[in-house]
UniProtKB/Swiss-Prot annotation:
Keywords, ordered alphabetically: Cytoplasm, DNA-binding, Sigma factor, Transcription, Transcription regulation
Compartments reported by the entry: Cytoplasm
Location of the motif Polymerase core binding: 34-47
InterPro entries reported in the protein's UniProt record: RNA_pol_sigma-70-like, RNA_pol_sigma-70_dom, RNA_pol_sigma-E_actinobac, RNA_pol_sigma70_ECF_CS, RNA_pol_sigma70_r2, RNA_pol_sigma70_r4_t2, RNA_pol_sigma_r2, RNA_pol_sigma_r3/r4-like
Function, in words: Sigma factors are initiation factors that promote the attachment of RNA polymerase to specific initiation sites and are then released. This sigma factor is required for normal cell wall integrity; it is recruited by RNA polymerase to transcribe genes with cell wall-related functions. It is also involved in the transcription of the dagA gene coding for an extracellular agar-degrading enzyme.
A GO-annotated cellular component: cytoplasm
Domain of life: Bacteria
DNA-binding residues: 128-147
UniProt induction comment: By CseB, in response to cell envelope stress.
GO terms, biological process: DNA-templated transcription initiation; regulation of DNA-templated transcription; response to stress
Gene giving rise to this polypeptide: sigE
This protein's record includes keyword Transcription: yes
Protein name, per record: RNA polymerase sigma-E factor
Length: 177
């Protein structure tokens, strides 16, 4: 009974932070809630095996990453490639919100492993060693994966900026004609 109360207290105190982590792993808010609930259910069944409860966040993040990867693999089989990706709707209430939405969208181009490394290092602000432990890889692998992921993100942002400029130029030419 004590383990159940301990788990409930853990969830109550960490729920907001864990939901933010889930939101960084999947862009859709409903999917993020589903991801967190699935991870919590899986963790609850193994709660007593976590000897050091201070590592519970890392354990749960690992479960979320694994679950997200399972979902991604299942969806990948169902997806049909298209010529052009649809634009994701953005609420342009503030420029910061727009930038965040752009970054969340650009993160989609990364492989799940790369996205996990970027999210844990830059959004969760985990050290290289903490990220390596959470993902079950060496610190060197984290560094090289992060390097490649950031290079890919830069390429994607440059490409999107060039596409946007070309569209603006075409629109100006069309209006001038």
């Amino acid at each position: 009974m004590g383990e159940v109360l301990e788990f409930e207290e853990y969830v109550r105190t960490r729920q907001d932070a864990l939901l933010r982590s889930a939101r960084r792993l999947v862009p859709d808010p409903v999917d993020a809630q589903d991801l967190l609930q699935t991870a919590l259910a899986r963790t609850y069944g193994r709660w007593e095996t976590i000897e050091d409860k201070r590592l519970a966040d890392a354990y749960l993040r690992r479960v979320m990453i694994n679950t997200r990867t399972e979902w991604w693999r299942a969806r990948k089989l169902e997806e049909v490639p298209t010529e052009q990706l649809p634009e994701s709707p953005m609420d342009d209430a503030t420029e910061q919100h727009a930038d965040r939405a752009l970054l969340m969208d650009v993160l989609k181009v990364l492989a799940p492993k790369q996205r996990s490394v970027v999210v844990l290092r830059h959004w969760e602000q985990m050290s290289t060693e903490e990220t390596a432990a959470a993902l079950g890889m060496s610190a060197g692998t984290v560094k090289s994966t992060l390097h490649r992921a950031l290079a890919r993100l830069r390429e994607e942002l440059v490409a999107r900026d060039l596409d946007a400029r070309a569209l603006e130029r075409e629109e100006r030419e069309r209006c001038a004609a």
